[in-house]
Amino acid sequence: MVARGTYSLPEELARHAPRERFAPDELRGACREAGEALGWEDARKATFRTAAQMVEMWRRLDLPAWEAPYILRDTRLGYLNGYERALISGEMSEEQISNAAESRWGQRWRERLRAARERSG
């Protein structure tokens, strides 16, 4: 039985969440955390999801209308943060990093990767 007033995440995010359903006040934080984990996972595979692809993940899911834009934004911010953190973590080979960075930033990936590393200190 599904608890009233709770919401599930898209399948791609749900596998990175601590449980299946969330109350409205928990949803944004859960989406940000799951987005970070998804970004990390995608970076390791050198796959980058566009904003449109991430919005598409939510199609057919019931979200509270007053929260939907913030949920999508928090998911995206988490995803971008997780992707960047994976690139600068030191846990990937240089080849993996260059492939993932190019997937994320295109031709200017070297410059943007350098900036990401500088931001991280």
How would you name each of these model-derived features?
Residues 1-121:
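Intrinsic-disorder/low-complexity detector
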